From Swiss-Prot:
Tissues of expression: Expressed in cauline leaves, stems, rosette leaves, immature siliques and primary inflorescences.
Domain notes: Contains a tandem repeat of a PAM2-like motif, which seems to be involved in the binding to the PABC/CTC domain of PAB proteins.
Composition bias type Polar residues, residue spans: 302-313, 326-346
Protein name: Polyadenylate-binding protein-interacting protein 4
Amino acid sequence: MSIPQSKSSSNGFPLKRGETEEVLHKTNTSNTVFNGEAGSLKRLSLDRLVYFTTCKIGHHVEVHLRNGSVYTGIFHAANVEKDFGIILKMACLIKDGTLRGHKSRSEFVRKPPSKTFIIPADELVQVIAKDLSVSSNNMSNAVQGEKPSELLTDSSISQSYHVDRERQLQRWVPDETIPHGADLENVFDNPWNRKWNQFEVNKSLFGVKSTFDEDLYTTRLERGPQTKQLEEHAQKIAREIEAETTRDIHVAEERGLQLNENFDFDEEARYSSVRPVTGFGDSGFDLEDNALLDTCNDLTFGGSSTSDGQKPASSGKGCEELRVSGDSQSSRKNKNVDQSCSTSKQQSKDFPAAGSNISESQLDEQRRKNNEEVSHNNRSAEESTSGHGDIKEGAKSGGGASSVSKAVTEREREASQVSSKTKSESSFGQSASRSSESRPGPSTSSRPGLSPSSSIGSMASSEKSTLNPNAKEFKLNPKAKSFKPLQSAAAPPQSPIADASFYYPGPSHVPVQQMPGMPPVNYGLPPYPGNQPQMMYHPQAYYHPNGQPQYPQQQMIPGQQQQQMIPGQQHPRPVYYMHPPPYPQDMPYHNKGRE
């Protein structure tokens, strides 16, 4: 729609933004005076221009300027009193008329749009608005269509506003040319459609050469001797996943699973991604929910999880089985205790007492006898813990009580022998027997239905224990102070040098000096975590005992000089007086240097 040019005002844009919007909605102007027939025609054309301009407010328009530039934006306001200047919101330049060369539109789009853009009337050529509604009926329909509904489903979205809203969706029925069971996964693998290639069609029809590479979107398959095995393993995992139960309607539809008949749903609920509020019930999935929870409980805690109302009738039998398993476990523990006791006895017998003279043949024979006794005890323990039927029969018979009492007395006698022998054993034998005997046996008095062998084992293990029964329990005092031992006086350092006739250690009170000319230890280096040899310097020299005789540091007595003749030497050797160093009292080698 072309707009006639009008003369621009002297001051460019005289009215403000608010005044322009107010003038835009006026249909009659008080400043315009019409006289006669010409005035009435002018007024009619102005009213029509104002009406069309008002209809453009809020619409996307395209504005052409005198220099050839084109702007797009939202029509916001216009000045219809004097000139026809307009204002655009979010204006973008799509064509620049000042440039001679052609410039692509994408380069202008990259620039950020102007929030408010004013176009004067002297630069305006035309304003183009597409799909503009000028009738009242169309405007009312458009306003009603802009009202958003609370919930939009596929059926409401697909329906038009000009038709009935109760239209039902139609089921799609494939044509006869499409085979049965065709889906998106195998549609290109079918022989009837195998010749179709998307990239070849695009190249032949549109001349577009595709650079598609499936390795960019999927995992690259390494072809090799193990490819077939990997494919079979992947197919096995896929079958296991597809065989699992699901509560998702769409997943069940994809896998071809039959849903519960009690579940009421329509085509929209089956294929739509929008779940409506009404008409969707999951009452048919109550049993499946319970089964799913039971399965999860079985996987998490183990065993069979049943509700209170579905307890099996053989609950008493289950209790009996649990009791039997508990008895068998206790008997196994007591059997292990007996074996540990017998092992400790064997170790104590294998190591004779200190001071006894036993030959190797006698020691081997004693070990062989101990092994036979251990194997015999193990067999008897296995027979006693083989089952409840044997225990009950032995208890009913007359000799059962006597056999049990004999076994108890025999165990007591063996325990007393072991305790008497351990007093004269070696340290290794004592540690081995005490470590095995000090293990506390499991408490089986609180469990019902225990076997006699288990009670005997517990009695024997309790009698063999060397713990003090009258000892009191140790309780930690939270108010007690921490114990700090007193630092005793440092012992005098022992000389690491061998004792010799000419070695004189320095006095104990003289501090150790650093070797001259040597840098301090760890200078400029991190400390070494291990033991480091200390480099010390002592004023006293060390003389090797087997070397040439040397003389210690001597001091000349002023005014005294003696000579001593040694046989075999021509020159006399001077004798000097030497001050004796103060030796500490604890040194075992003091006075040895002057002998």
